[in-house]
């Protein structure tokens, strides 16, 4: 069974790797997932962590007197060093097997159609893979642009802020992969809300409006009978 560990603790957090980052002492939620990922959360930023370590990574504990240090190390030698001052809650739970996100019919069909006609994203675009799996879920499409750069594409029927946030999380994770980086983002939807477009533009994510009716009229190998 899949187990997740939730810890609420007064702690400081230091990231040591290609760069350094420090979070001063505060009460935070520490999330340890069965896939090996570790994330540090505050009571804001919605679901976006303050810092995290993607799998594979390993947790060890160093003695630190009154403040033990939990050290999370990934295969590249980067570390999250969590100095635990006080633990208020520590529990583990079995979540079972998750069925995964089920897209509605239109979104699923948009993904199929855009994968077949990826040139709608731009001249020279090629498809690498549909449902490109990451530690936090599948990216709808992973493509290459005309210059060979990696592009992550998130597809929605209605483009709202939560979709931009989802793509942002994928991009932050994918850009840690030295093989893929730098990875650009495209937010594609039938309709994109103004607030979502503004947020995407601010984060360097390109928005593409999809004409579903026109795309359905295109020649499709998947749905051809003869």
UniProtKB/Swiss-Prot annotation:
Task: Give the enzyme's EC designation.
Answer: 3.1.-.-
Coiled-coil stretches: none
| Name of the protein in its database record | Endonuclease NucS
Top-tier EC class: hydrolase
Give the family this protein belongs to, as stated in its UniProt record. Belongs to the NucS endonuclease family.
Pfam families of this UniProt entry? Answer: NucS_C, NucS_N
User: How far does the signal peptide extend, from start to end residue?
Assistant: none
Cite the entry's keywords alphabetically. Cytoplasm, DNA-binding, Endonuclease, Hydrolase, Nuclease
Domain of life of the organism in this record? Bacteria
What are the protein's GO molecular function terms? DNA binding; single-stranded DNA endodeoxyribonuclease activity
